[in-house]
Amino acid sequence: MKPKLLIAIFALAIAATGCMTHEAAGNMGEKLDISQFYLPNADASKVVSVSSTTNGPVGATVYIQTHAVAVKETGPKETVAKFGEVYAFSPGFVAVHKDEPTLIHFLNLQPDDNHDFMLYAPDQVFMKLLLPPLQDTAYVFTFHREGLFNILCAMHQPSMAGQILVLPPRPK
């Protein structure tokens, strides 16, 4: 990812206001600033609404795992020395349907590393949430706009990124 684009994404994330705070616990006693974690505000909910509970049937369920590609404990020393620890989302691409509630589980499989999840489009950051170690964090997403949305872990860039493609509604 280009540095200017990444800086713009972080600036949008910092500028987001009026969003709900995501409740999060620190990693192994580490104190976290949970004000950096939020769900879509009223304006963003016109594009994607997110709920921590299912208020009815979901159309699909998706599992996205954190994946350690090269880490200090088991990765090739040359790779870790040159690039640092490298992580990825698996799968890195998900397709969903417009206006169809989709339950997405985020499984952080690392016992000693926090990750986060940021959902954004070129014009706006919609949400950011913490993915604590060894936890399943689940939300119901309903996208109200077709198109391509980007996802990333801001803690592990540039490798930990992906996309969600919102397709037209399913035929009835």
Language-model features, listed with the residues they occupy:
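Juxtadomain low-complexity/linker regions and immediately adjacent membrane-anchoring helices
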Residues: 43-47, 51
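Histidine- and aromatic-enriched segments that form or immediately flank copper-ligand environments
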Residues: 81-82, 105-135, 139, 161-163
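N-terminal edge beta-strand
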Residues: 60-101
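C-terminal motif of bacterial Sec signal peptides marking the signal peptidase cleavage site
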Residues: 16-18
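Sec-dependent N-terminal signal peptides
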Residues: 5-13
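Solvent-exposed coil/turn segments that connect beta secondary-structure elements
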Residues: 101, 107-111, 122-124, 144-146, ...
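Extracellular/periplasmic metallocenter environments
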Residues: 20-43, 56-73, 131-172
